[in-house]
Regions:
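Beta-strand-rich binding-surface signature
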Residues: 15, 57, 173-175
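Bergerat-fold GHKL ATPase/HATPase_c domain
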Residues: 1-55, 88-92, 226-231, 238
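Conserved structural-core and active-site-/substrate-pathway-adjacent residues in large, well-folded domains
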Residues: 18, 41-44, 58, 115, ...
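A short glycine-centered beta->alpha linker in the GHKL/HATPase_c
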Residues: 84-86
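GHKL-type ATPase core
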Residues: 2-5, 89, 100-235
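ATP-lid-like helix-loop hinge signature
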Residues: 43-77
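Mobile ATP-lid/nucleotide-binding loop of the nucleotide-binding subdomain
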Residues: 93-97
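Acidic ATP/Mg2+-coordinating residue in the GHKL
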Residues: 80
Length: 241
């Protein structure tokens, strides 16, 4: 075998791998991508609230016609009243794959630090626009805003803009806004069903959803009783070498 025929080897960053294989995370077409983005953002919002003993209030909207001549591009906005994210962690939390607060032995809805970043990555691939994140922690006097994208080759966040504002209320939580190429007509039945089922399994949550036709669905919490927040635990002795 000549030297010219030898195979060449190279490594891929996690971001580059999922960029090439986005269907693995459920982003195989515009309809599934719209549904999966909503699901990832809402489940992050629930984890930021009920995992810390906060009764969730989650507001979701999907808007169309934001970009002229591109009716297939939608703006997704999800707001929660959770614990918020410290500003130093916001870029990595939304724009670095395999970076997460969930790499602990504690039950949460996500495990791998991939979901919301895949929504950001798909948004970046299909629209070229950064994600916008606003967040404030419970005891903070300020709201922090970032516009971010992912450096796919190096799996690092790219900060396009950042700012902070003095809070005029006691609000705490996170707001995420991202543009995405989607197919509302094909995805809407799954999205409506997802909200109905989420309201059933989390009856302590208030969820407000506005669709692209400006129809508003309001799921009012039916109880204030919540399951105890999960605790981080030590590994089981059987799994220790």
């Amino acid at each position: 075998v000549s030297i010219q025929q030898l195979e060449r080897f190279r490594s891929l960053s996690p971001a580059e791998f999922f960029y090439r294989n986005k269907e693995i995370a459920g982003f195989s077409n515009p309809a599934r991508a719209l549904y999966q983005s909503i699901r990832e953002l809402v489940e992050n919002a629930l984890d930021a609230t009920d995992s810390y003993g906060i009764l969730p209030v989650i507001k979701v909207s999907i808007d169309s016609g934001i970009i002229p001549d591109k009716p297939e591009v939608y703006l997704i906005s999800v707001e929660d009243n959770g614990i918020g994210i410290p500003p130093d962690n916001i870029p990595q939390a939304f724009a670095q794959l395999l970076y997460s607060s969930k790499y602990v032995l504690r039950q949460t809805r996500g495990m791998f630090g991939i979901g919301v970043k895949m929504a950001v990555l798909y948004s970046q691939i299909t629209t070229g626009k950064p994600v916008e994140v606003l967040s404030s922690t419970i005891n903070s006097s300020r709201i922090y805003m970032f516009r971010l994208s992912i450096d796919i080759k190096n799996n690092r966040p790219v900060i396009h803009h950042k700012a902070s504002f003095k809070k005029s209320s006691e609000w705490h939580g996170t707001i995420v806004k991202l543009f995405i190429e989607g197919d509302w007509n094909r995805a809407k039945s799954r999205i409506y069903e997802y909200f109905k089922r989420t309201a059933m399994i989390a009856p302590y949550a208030t969820i407000v959803f506005k669709d692209p036709s400006n129809n508003v669905i309001y799921f009012k919490r039916s109880t204030t009783l919540m399951p105890k927040p999960p605790r981080e635990v030590k590994p089981h002795p059987h799994g220790i070498d």
